[in-house]
């Protein structure tokens, strides 16, 4: 098992998570005793204890006082916060993970974009006004796209959408910086922003779902043209 880590705690965390992913520690199994596991990994018991607590908070493990630590089925117990970890664990499946991520974000964003234009159209107008000074670079587009989604999610009348979006942030930001290296992708996005701005100025939230659906289909086709050339390093979060 080859693990790149920045320190003992990072190494221990990646070792345990990789072992769970590879079914060395399968769901429902009991982790080795603390002393045995710390010797196996090569870290102090104090470091291991901190790592186990962190992994339990993320849903990988179940820790109960006086009982051995049990491995969870992370698909049932974890949240969006492990997306980055899954990408790092399974680089071969990363393009499919991104497909699923983009599909999920498109479906959810249609709801909060409509909500924002319905309940806070002036906020939508203000953030969309920034497109007229948007630099034609991948970095600028990726940053603005996240700003737009974050602002409209918060203004939709249901701030829980912001928490969902935050779960996508790190992974989506890296993918976005790659996606927007395409001038065609930037032009497609700019036209979408302009159409959305017109709807916001008119306080027309009813036509948002149709616009989102069209842009989702077109950007999905664009992504399929770009994803095979995506650098493998994008899957790595540290």
From Swiss-Prot:
HAMAP family: HTH_FadR (MF_00696)
Known role: Multifunctional regulator of fatty acid metabolism.
Subcellular location: Cytoplasm
Keyword DNA-binding recorded: yes
Name of the protein this chain belongs to: Fatty acid metabolism regulator protein
DNA-binding residues (ranges): 34-53
GO cellular component: cytoplasm
A Pfam cross-reference name: FadR_C
The HTH gntR-type domain, residue ranges: 6-74
Gene Ontology annotations of biological process type: fatty acid metabolic process; regulation of fatty acid metabolic process
Principal subcellular localisation of the protein: cytoplasm
CDD domains attached to this UniProt entry: WHTH_GntR
Record keywords, A-Z: Activator, Cytoplasm, DNA-binding, Fatty acid metabolism, Lipid metabolism, Repressor, Transcription, Transcription regulation
UniProt GO molecular function: DNA binding; DNA-binding transcription factor activity; fatty-acyl-CoA binding
Gene3D superfamilies according to UniProt: GntR ligand-binding domain-like (1.20.120.530), Winged helix-like DNA-binding domain superfamily/Winged helix DNA-binding domain (1.10.10.10)
Cytoplasm listed as a keyword: yes
Quaternary structure note: Homodimer.
């Amino acid at each position: 098992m080859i693990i790149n880590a920045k320190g003992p705690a990072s190494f221990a965390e990646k070792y345990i998570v990789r072992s769970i992913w590879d079914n060395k520690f399968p769901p429902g199994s009991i982790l080795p005793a603390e002393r045995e596991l710390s010797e196996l990994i090569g870290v102090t018991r104090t470091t291991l204890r901190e790592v186990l607590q962190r992994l339990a908070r993320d849903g990988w493990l179940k820790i109960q006082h006086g009982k051995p630590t049990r491995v969870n089925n992370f698909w049932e117990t974890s949240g969006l916060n492990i997306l980055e970890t899954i990408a790092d664990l399974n680089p071969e499946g990363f393009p499919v993970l991104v497909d699923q991520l983009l599909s999920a974000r498109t479906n959810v964003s249609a709801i909060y974009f409509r909500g924002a234009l319905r309940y806070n159209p002036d906020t939508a107008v203000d953030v969309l006004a920034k497109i007229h000074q948007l630099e034609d670079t991948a970095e600028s587009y990726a940053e603005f796209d996240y700003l737009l989604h974050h602002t409209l999610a918060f203004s939709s009348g249901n701030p829980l959408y912001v928490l969902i979006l935050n779960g996508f942030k790190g992974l989506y930001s890296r993918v976005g910086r790659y996606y927007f290296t395409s001038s065609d992708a930037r032009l497609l996005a700019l036209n979408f922003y302009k159409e959305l701005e017109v709807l916001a100025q008119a306080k027309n939230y009813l036509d948002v779902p149709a616009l989102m659906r069209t842009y989702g289909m077109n950007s999905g086709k664009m992504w399929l043209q770009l994803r095979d050339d995506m650098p493998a390093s994008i899957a790595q979060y540290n």
